[in-house]
Structures are given as structure tokens and as C-alpha cells.
């Protein structure tokens, strides 16, 4: 089984997350996708909304028979993606994991804790995001792992590829971001 992992704050979850999840299922040869709704993001200056609220909203929004919305990082007590991947690989030895991220995250991936360990442990599927394509393709991570890049036409092989392997796919984009939704007050302004 090949499982894509889409981690993030999901603060709030929105239709753009659903869109890239459906695209990842189609493009990367995945059997399932697990959303890893994180307790917090070490790279963000302020804490997210309560985890229970984000999980409930994510489960309301993401309804697909091949997608599970989880709070695994809180359950297993990990803070960084590399730690989470190590635990999941030990816990599920028969599962092939693929890390999923938007191009905006690839652009700053080199700031993540043990980012090279992530690239070396699982294939990485990168999905285009508005305004982030060039920054992502020229990022330190993209340059460091240029030889491991699969052509977009071979994206379906990603789930069966040995790490390091990554693939950047273009897709119809939705110009939505959690940051912009929070800025409008539509998320934080709601009762917890």
C-alpha cells in the first residue's frame, strides 16, 4: 500500500487542501492519503486554533473513501516531520509513504528540521501553488536533489520509487490559503 501524507496546521482547512489531496491521489499512484493535522508548526510565530477544532473542521470538509484525517502527530508525540516519518515507518513497515507538500513549502523546505532526512527517507510529491513555482524549483532543496527529480509525465511512479525521489506537478490551482482566510477573521472569529 502507498500512502501519501499531507501534513500541516490546517488552520483552517479549506477547499484548496481537498483539491490538492484529490490531485495527489490521481497523480502520484497513491492508494490512500492521510492528513496529519499538526498540533503546531515550529516555523510559525503564533499557535494555531485548538487541535480538536481543526480536526473537526477537516473531517467535515474532507470526505473521501481513500482519505483519513488524523491527529497522529499529537497521538505519537512528535513535533517534527522527520520524527513523525520515522515513527510511522516503524509502526507500518509494509506501507510505502510519500510526503506531500505544496510548492510554497518546497521553497522553504531547507528551513525544516532535518529536511535532508525527510528527502532521504520517503519520496516527496510537490503540488504547484499560486506564485510559488519558480521559488520552489530554484530552492536549496530542489537544487540539492535535482538528480532525484522525476519528470512530471512519470509522476505515477513516485509512490513506488526509492528515496530520494521527488516530483513537481502542475495542476489547476485554487487561489486559497489558510493565512488569507485567517486574515479575514472568518476562522479566528468563530467560537471555539
From Swiss-Prot:
GO molecular function, one term: ATP binding
Coiled-coil residues: none
InterPro entries: Cyt_trans-like, NadD/NMNAT, Rossmann-like_a/b/a_fold
A single BP term in Gene Ontology: NAD biosynthetic process
Sorted UniProt keywords: ATP-binding, NAD, Nucleotide-binding, Nucleotidyltransferase, Pyridine nucleotide biosynthesis, Transferase
Keyword Transferase: yes
Record field: catalytic activity: nicotinate beta-D-ribonucleotide + ATP + H(+) = deamido-NAD(+) + diphosphate
Pathway: Cofactor biosynthesis; NAD(+) biosynthesis; deamido-NAD(+) from nicotinate D-ribonucleotide: step 1/1
Enzyme Commission designation: 2.7.7.18
HAMAP family (UniProt xref): NaMN_adenylyltr
Role played: Catalyzes the reversible adenylation of nicotinate mononucleotide (NaMN) to nicotinic acid adenine dinucleotide (NaAD).
Family to which this protein belongs: Belongs to the NadD family.
Descriptive protein name: Probable nicotinate-nucleotide adenylyltransferase
Gene of this entry: nadD
Amino acid at each position: 500500500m502507498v500512502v501519501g501524507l499531507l501534513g500541516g496546521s490546517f488552520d483552517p482547512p479549506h477547499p484548496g487542501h481537498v483539491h490538492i489531496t484529490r490531485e495527489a491521489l490521481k497523480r502520484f499512484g497513491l492508494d490512500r492519503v492521510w492528513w496529519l493535522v499538526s498540533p503546531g508548526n515550529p516555523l510559525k510565530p503564533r499557535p494555531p486554533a485548538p487541535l480538536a477544532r481543526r480536526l473537526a473542521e477537516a473531517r467535515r470538509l474532507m470526505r473521501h473513501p481513500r482519505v483519513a484525517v488524523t491527529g497522529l502527530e499529537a497521538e505519537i508525540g512528535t513535533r517534527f516531520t522527520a520524527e513523525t516519518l520515522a515513527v510511522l515507518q516503524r509502526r507500518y513497515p509494509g506501507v510505502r509513504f510519500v510526503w506531500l507538500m505544496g510548492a510554497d513549502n518546497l521553497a522553504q523546505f531547507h528551513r525544516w528540521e532535518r529536511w535532508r532526512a525527510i528527502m532521504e527517507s520517503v519520496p516527496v510529491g510537490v503540488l504547484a501553488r499560486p506564485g510559488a513555482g519558480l521559488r520552489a524549483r530554484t530552492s536549496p532543496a530542489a537544487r540539492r536533489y535535482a538528480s532525484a527529480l522525476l519528470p512530471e509525465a512519470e509522476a505515477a511512479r513516485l509512490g513506488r520509487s526509492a528515496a530520494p525521489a521527488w516530483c513537481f506537478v502542475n495542476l489547476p490551482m485554487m487561489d486559497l490559503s489558510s493565512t488569507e482566510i485567517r486574515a479575514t477573521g472568518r476562522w479566528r472569529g468563530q467560537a471555539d
